[in-house]
């Protein structure tokens, strides 16, 4: 299968993006944590001030999934800023359906993301990978990624909404 297109997502792609987000969450054993809706994706990514950007991988009709889908991969990203090095492209989610891996789709998505990062004068691209996900770790390392957890000793933290509300209400 040599034919596929990587393109910016449109509002019409939201149902496919959500489907792929759920597939990725299932792959990561976190399926029950997806609470996002198609409406959220539409409002958050395609309004006046989008919170995210997205690329999709689309195959022609002769290569549709068994369920009839043409969107077989996606990358969701946004821009952020590091006060030490400047602009960053943060890759939030990146997934290609298992039946479509090995055809260069993931490599082409990453190439497109790299072009976006360079066009926007970003100094690097950051992302998370589950420790157990050796195929993805190897995919990124083959392309020059470095593991900041082991090399620089950083830890990722989060503050859930209930604690944000509590802190926001403090006097």
From Swiss-Prot:
Claim: Cytoplasm is one of the keywords in the record: yes
Catalytic residues (UniProt): 140
GO BP, sorted A to Z: angiogenesis; polyamine biosynthetic process; putrescine catabolic process; spermidine acetylation
SUPFAM superfamilies the record matches: Acyl-CoA N-acyltransferases (Nat) (SSF55729)
EC number: 2.3.1.57
Signal sequence region: none
Protein name in the entry: Diamine acetyltransferase 1
Organism: Sus scrofa
Lineage: Eukaryota, Metazoa, Chordata, Craniata, Vertebrata
Annotated gene: SAT1
């Amino acid at each position: 299968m040599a034919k596929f297109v990587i393109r910016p997502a449109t509002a019409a792609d939201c149902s496919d993006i959500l489907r792929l987000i759920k597939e990725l969450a299932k792959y990561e054993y976190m399926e029950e944590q997806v609470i996002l809706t198609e409406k959220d994706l539409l409002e958050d990514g395609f309004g006046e001030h989008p919170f995210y950007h997205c690329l999709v991988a689309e195959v022609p009709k002769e290569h549709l999934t068994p369920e009839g889908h043409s969107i077989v991969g996606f990358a969701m990203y946004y821009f952020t800023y590091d006060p030490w090095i400047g602009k960053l492209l943060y890759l939030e989610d990146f997934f290609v359906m298992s039946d479509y891996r090995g055809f260069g789709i993931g490599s082409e998505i990453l190439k497109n993301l790299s072009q976006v990062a360079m066009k926007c004068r970003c100094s690097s691209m950051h992302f998370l990978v589950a420790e157990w996900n050796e195929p993805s770790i190897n995919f990124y390392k083959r392309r020059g990624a470095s593991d900041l957890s082991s090399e620089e000793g950083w830890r990722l933290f989060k503050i859930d909404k209930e604690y944000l509300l509590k802190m926001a209400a403090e006097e």
